[in-house]
Amino acid sequence: MKNRIKQDLQALMLVPGLSGYEERVAGYLKKQLQALGLSTRSDRLGNLLVQFPGTGPKVMLFTHMDQLGFVVRKIEDDGFLRVERLGGVPERALAGQPVLVCVGEGRDVAGVF
């Protein structure tokens, strides 16, 4: 069970979900919850809601679906990307880190800082 939780968390963390662009995370979670036989719904703000059946005390769990990341602001003629940070990403931790550039419509391009 411990290994399964680790695998599920790793898979979830690899789903791109920058602040304001959390749809892929919500879709991933919705699919996983529906596979467990649970119904889901979304509100007008994009929050994913699920109710677990039971008779015990009601508990609400909420968390962010978004991640720190970057937005591409310019693509230079040589293909170099100029990016702007979203959130508190520390610059000193970036060199050599793998990145995933989400082009749109599920088309992603792997790269390195």
Name what the model sees in each region:
Residues M1-F113:
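N-terminal hydrophobic/helix-forming segments and targeting peptides
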